[in-house]
Amino acid sequence: MLDKPCIDHRIYTIRLRKMNEFLDVFDRLAMPVLLETLGTPLGFYTSHVGPQNQFVHLWAYESLADYERRSRLRDTHPDFPAYLAASEHLIVAQETRLIRAVDLASIKHLWRPEGYGRQ
């Protein structure tokens, strides 16, 4: 079980044949800001089966208030507009979902104490 129960599950749909360009822009311009303001991510993924050209990232938060506080830090960071401008033409759609962890007794023994993955 994750120690931060609120997860930002974000999905970007990227223009056809532009994923590599998007990943470069994201890594160079967004990641420094995100690491500084949001902290360590849970992971990054691209779609393999199902809808294509999608980039997914997951960030964990203590609460909705923690999500809102760190999101404000990101949105007001002086370097963040450069990423927004550089990526605007690459993104077709964005979905942002806040999902909550479910604590199931039947699988508690599968998770490490620090909460990030199976033993």
Predicted regions located by residue number:
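Surface-exposed interaction/gating patches
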Residues: 1-25, 32-33, 40-41, 103-106, ...
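An amphipathic, aromatic/His-enriched active-site/gating alpha helix that lines ligand/cofactor pockets
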Residues: 2, 24-42, 62-99
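Short, well-ordered beta-strand segments in beta-rich or mixed alpha/beta enzyme
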Residues: 6-13, 45-75, 95-97, 110-116
